[in-house]
Amino acid sequence: SGLQFAVLDGQGFLPFPRV
């Protein structure tokens, strides 16, 4: 991932940027 908004990622909701 690498988004700045909370989005449904492979590990769940990421409310912050992640690689």
Curated annotation (Swiss-Prot):
Family indicated by similarity: Belongs to the periviscerokinin family.
A cellular component annotation (GO) from this entry: extracellular region
Function: Mediates visceral muscle contractile activity (myotropic activity).
A biological process from GO: neuropeptide signaling pathway
Name used for this protein in its record: CAPA-Periviscerokinin-2
Residues annotated with Valine amide modification: 19
Key words of the record: Amidation, Neuropeptide, Secreted
Major subcellular location class: secreted
Subcellular compartments: Secreted
Highest taxon above the source species: Eukaryota
Species this chain originates from: Austrophasma rawsonvillense
